[in-house]
Every structure is written in structure tokens, then in C-alpha cells.
Amino acid sequence: MASNNPHDNLSDQTPSDDFFEQILGLPNFSASSAAGLSGVDGGLGGGAPPMMLQLGSGEEGSHMGGLGGSGPTGFHNQMFPLGLSLDQGKGPGFLRPEGGHGSGKRFSDDVVDNRCSSMKPVFHGQPMQQPPPSAPHQPTSIRPRVRARRGQATDPHSIAERLRRERIAERIRALQELVPTVNKTDRAAMIDEIVDYVKFLRLQVKVLSMSRLGGAGAVAPLVTDMPLSSSVEDETGEGGRTPQPAWEKWSNDGTERQVAKLMEENVGAAMQLLQSKALCMMPISLAMAIYHSQPPDTSSVVKPENNPPQ
């Protein structure tokens, strides 16, 4: 509780503490309180003089004086009567004296009211902070993430490369179906075999085409890849055997029967066998024409076979 000595230095106190110090320091406050408590009607004494309130900040060194005392003039050191009597029946609050000094009293009452209102914490003056209205939830269009399977990429270049490899694999499988007995383990060897097979087919087509046109003599080097005279054995061997044509030798070693058997079972295998021996299939009439078109060798006479291969 603050001290009742009016001459204490109250410069470090707030205006609200200064106000209470002035009210509690008045000598008439205790007398009017005692008279009010002893009254029958429970009010304050009717003859009690009004309290005097000094409005000042407490910074100039003089706070309390007599009711009619003289002090420094000015707003901060003026004494104003403060009516606290409740016998008027006009409700609670400070009572304004009826006699007045004009605008000076009204100004002092306004100052008192303002200082009293500053003592009370104002809660109703602060507006309630409303939470900002939440924006309506709008579903964002999120691009679905494409999850790649194991061993596959989602990059466009990688996808294009994978599609290219798949097309190459499909073409190679198609070639494997066209060329039988091809090596399927080594891709490089398989491609070499396919190239040789295509060359062999082209040779057969050329031979058949020239036989149709009557160029049987020009077909013989293409069929055997060597002159027909070179395919004949030496005139005399160690056993003194007579030479025989090459086609007779091929017929005697079972090549003809093997090719005929493969033609019934697998045409591709028969073609492969002929290709391995540098042979090709042609009509018998074309073979006979090629054979008879070759001039006889002066060193040896080639005896034609009576029963040519069928």
C-alpha cells in the first residue's frame, strides 16, 4: 500500500497510482467515510464537504495542499472538488457540483472521467479477430507419376531405343524362320549364314533364268563355280582307274539320295546341304544340256552315263 505522506516523491509511479494516492491522502475522506457508515440510510453524511482532487502528473514536486491553498497555477496543479456523496440518489459515479465556474468545471470533470476510464482495462474496445475465411478446397491437377517396371526406363530416348531393339529382334526371328538350321546362339554367325543363304538363292534364280533363255553353256561355271573340265579327275590314277565326271562322283557318294530325302522332309535342310557342297538344283534337261555343251577333252574322253540322275 502506498504511503499517506503527501510530500513523498511519486514521480516514478503511474498516473493510476497517483490517483489512488491523492484519494487516500485526503483527510476529509476518512471523516466522510465514518459519517456515512454511522448514518441510518447507509449513505454518506449530508454535510460532508466534497473531496478535492488535484490533477497533476506528480513531476513538479507539489501534490497535495489545502482545500483553498495556493500553489502553482496551471492545469497540473489545480484542485478540483470531487463529489462522492451518494445521498443525491442519482446513481453511482462521480457527482458534479451544481455551482460552477463554467467551462473550467466541465473540463475538469471530463479529465476525471478520462482518467477513471484509463484505470479500467478495456476489453470490449478490441475487436475480435475473426479467422480468415478458408478458401474452398480445389483439387490440384497433379500429373500422375509413371512408375517404370524393373529394367525399363521412362525417358523418351530410352523408350525409343527399347522399341528399336524390339523391332530388330522381331526381324531376326523372322529371318530365323525363313532360313532353317541357322545358328541361333551367335547373332553375328547367324547373319553370315543368312547372307550366304541369300546368295545361294540368287544363284539358283540366275541359273534357272538363263536355262529358260537357252544360255546353258554360260550356266555351267555358275553352277559348279569352276570349269567343268577341272572337275574331272586325272586321266590315270594310282590304281589306273578311268576318270569319271564330277556329277557321277556326287551321285555315287549318296549326295543325291540324301538331298532327295531331305527334300521330302525339310526343303530348307536340303538347300543347306546343297549350299555346303556348292551345288544347286536344276532340271535334268538343263543338266544334260550343260554337260553336252562342253567340248570333249583331247587327253581323255569323258564317257557319258547311260542313266543320268533322276
Swiss-Prot record:
The record's section on InterPro entries has: bHLH_dom (IPR011598), HLH_DNA-bd_sf (IPR036638), IND-like (IPR045843)
Q: What is its main location?
A: nucleus
Using the record's annotation, list all stretches that form the bHLH domain.
152-201
**Which tissues does the record link to its expression?**
Expressed constitutively in roots, leaves, stems, and flowers.
Q: Does this UniProt record's set of keywords contain Transmembrane helix?
A: no
UniProt region (Disordered), positions on chain: 124-156, 229-253
For biological process, the GO terms are:
double fertilization forming a zygote and endosperm; regulation of defense response; regulation of DNA-templated transcription; regulation of gene expression; regulation of salicylic acid mediated signaling pathway; response to abscisic acid; response to osmotic stress; response to salt
Which of UniProt's keywords are assigned here?
Developmental protein, DNA-binding, Nucleus, Transcription, Transcription regulation
Give the superkingdom in one word.
Answer: Eukaryota
One cellular component GO annotation, for this chain's record? nucleus
The protein's GO terms of the molecular function aspect are: DNA binding; DNA-binding transcription factor activity; protein dimerization activity
Give its localization.
Nucleus
- What's a Pfam family in this record? HLH
Keyword presence, rRNA-binding: no
Matching SUPFAM superfamilies, A to Z?
Answer: HLH, helix-loop-helix DNA-binding domain
Q: How does it assemble?
A: Homodimer.
Q: What does this protein do?
A: Required for ovule fertilization.
What is the name attached to this protein's record? Transcription factor UNE12
Organism, by scientific name, is Arabidopsis thaliana (Mouse-ear cress)
Q: What is the lineage of its organism?
A: Eukaryota, Viridiplantae, Streptophyta, Embryophyta, Tracheophyta
